[in-house]
Amino acid sequence: MRDSHPVEQTVGIEYYVTETDGTGGRLRDRPADFRVREREAFGADCRPLDADPGSYPHLVFRATLREWDTNDFASAVSNALGVSRERVSWAGTKDKHAVTTQLFSVRHDDAALPDLDGADIEPIGRAGRPVLFGDLAGNEFELVIRDPDRPEHAEATAAELCDFGGGEAGVPNYFGTQRFGSRRPITHRVGLDVLDGDWEAAAVRYVCESSEREPERTQEVREGIDADRDWAAAGERLPGSLRFERAIANRLAEGAESPDDYRAALEELPSNLQRMFVNAAQSYVFNRILSERLRRGLPFDEPVVGDVVCFSDSDGNPDPDRTQTVTESRLETVRRHCERGRAFVTAPLVGTETVFGDGEPAEITREVLADVDVSPTDFELPGEFGSSGTRRAVLVTTDLTVEQEPLTLSFSLPKGSYATVVAREFLKADPEALS
């Protein structure tokens, strides 16, 4: 186990689990170097394209996107069709600098969809409900590592990951740095402001806090707005690409006197982005819990007394709604379930209904929460900001293959797990090389 990159440590990712020196190199030298294809799980809800739009109002389509941010693509579709952005939904958010194939739906009577640069769009049917976030079994990845310094180290790293995963390649199920903002990893800090009830700090941080990884001009604009708080001018000064920051600034220009004004400004964002802030805070706490579990030497592929495990669903993936706290008397039985892939050790994505478990795992969670000054009751928040919490497996295993010339990693992951968390163990590089 070795210390991670300093940028990763700011989002709770404190260690690598492999000791082999990194291959070096970089991902995403070109979009085709990072390919993602969803393993779809929506077929049973889909009807033919000629189904009655009155009964099946949601048009379901598959899109292969090249260098499209998911939110930007949804906005482009809604604008082209002349419908509300909230009518467009999707199964999973993907990386922009990639070639991705994923499922969307739009509430729209006409089966015709727009032609957009960098997008191949295939209508596949109609449904009585929208495609919702999480309506997928997982994702298949093919990642090319360009210009590695030590490509021969990849096989040794893969072998170490198999040891960590208990026979199959495994990594801690960290949330990757892109969860928090690839260039400006602050969404968890905005979320912590929200949990603290400081709506002003949250809105101001999102608009004004700069990062040295951003263009110099963008840094200057953010810092200038922070200094003068001239929200009326801010909407014009911010680059057009920062449309969410502009939306917040424009709302604050109408009034920035009370906490409710700042909360209303954050509510100008699409609902999924409103949820993103508290979700990122939960993810940060989760990463911290995993790092402390690693530091203490607790296993990831099998439980200890006090762990909360969840059981597998019909697809063999973790089902966070079916859980059990591991007692001394049940330890060996649950270990066998984990060994056979029927149960998974979990940690909490903390919310109002979080169950801590017992023993050392619960102690870790409480220590991390105390350190970030968060409690489950803090998640009792209005609208999209509140969360009851859930659980997430601490380990993710995969059918990893490694090929040389060019160095290529191929694997699949369950929904919600990050390809860069696998890739980082190989490159051991600045997270910017992964993004």
UniProtKB/Swiss-Prot annotation:
Known catalytic reactions: uridine(13) in tRNA = pseudouridine(13) in tRNA
UniProt xrefs under PROSITE patterns: TRUD, UPF0024
Keywords: Isomerase, tRNA processing
Any Gene Ontology biological process: tRNA pseudouridine synthesis
Presence of keyword Transferase: no
GO MF assignments: RNA binding; tRNA pseudouridine(13) synthase activity
Enzyme Commission number(s): 5.4.99.27
Cross-referenced InterPro entries: PsdUridine_synth_cat_dom_sf (IPR020103), PsdUridine_synth_TruD (IPR001656), PsdUridine_synth_TruD_CS (IPR020119), PsdUridine_synth_TruD_insert (IPR011760), TruD_catalytic (IPR042214)
Gene3D superfamilies listed in its UniProt record: 1.10.1510.30, 3.30.70.3160, TruD, catalytic domain
Domain TRUD: 170-396
Keyword check for Cell division: no
Catalytic site: 95
Source domain of life: Archaea
Name of a matching Pfam family: TruD
Family listed: Belongs to the pseudouridine synthase TruD family.
HAMAP family listed in its UniProt record: TruD
Function: Could be responsible for synthesis of pseudouridine from uracil-13 in transfer RNAs.
Protein's recorded name: Probable tRNA pseudouridine synthase D
Species the sequence originates in: Natronomonas pharaonis (strain ATCC 35678 / DSM 2160 / CIP 103997 / JCM 8858 / NBRC 14720 / NCIMB 2260 / Gabara) (Halobacterium pharaonis)
